[in-house]
């Protein structure tokens, strides 16, 4: 799958500011076992995302909401 990895504690995607190929996003995506990552829409987007890893939006927690 493809998508935004999510911080399960906050429900937020990982923010980024340098659009396109981005070392921070590549590292975040590799951390969860994805094949590749880049900054898209000010969030890290991962390709070849493992099916068993959560992605944004995270149903159990809405980013910035209680």
Curated annotation (Swiss-Prot):
CDD domains: neurotoxins_LC_scorpion
Domain of life: Eukaryota
Residue(s) carrying Cysteine amide: 63
Entry keywords, A to Z: Amidation, Disulfide bond, Ion channel impairing toxin, Neurotoxin, Secreted, Toxin, Voltage-gated sodium channel impairing toxin
Any one annotated GO CC term: extracellular region
Disulphides: 12-63, 16-39, 25-44, 29-46
Residue span(s) of domain LCN-type CS-alpha/beta: 1-64
SUPFAM superfamilies in the cross-refs: Scorpion toxin-like
Subcellular localization: Secreted
GO biological process: defense response
Gene3D superfamilies associated with the record: Knottin, scorpion toxin-like
InterPro entries per the UniProt record, alphabetical: LCN-type_CS_alpha_beta_dom, Scorpion_toxin-like, Scorpion_toxin-like_sf, Scorpion_toxinL, Scorpion_toxinL/defensin
Propeptide section residues: 64-66
Listed SMART domains: Knot1 (SM00505)
Domain notes: Has the structural arrangement of an alpha-helix connected to antiparallel beta-sheets by disulfide bonds (CS-alpha/beta).
Entry function: Beta toxins bind voltage-independently at site-4 of sodium channels (Nav) and shift the voltage of activation toward more negative potentials thereby affecting sodium channel activation and promoting spontaneous and repetitive firing.
Protein name: Neurotoxin Cex11
Organism: Centruroides exilicauda (Bark scorpion)
């Amino acid at each position: 799958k493809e998508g935004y990895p999510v911080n399960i504690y906050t429900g937020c995607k990982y923010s980024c500011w340098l659009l396109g190929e981005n070392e921070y996003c590549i590292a975040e995506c590799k951390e969860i076992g994805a094949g590749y990552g880049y900054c898209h829409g000010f969030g890290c987007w991962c390709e070849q995302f493992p099916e068993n890893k959560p992605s944004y939006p995270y149903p159990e927690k809405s980013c910035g909401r209680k």
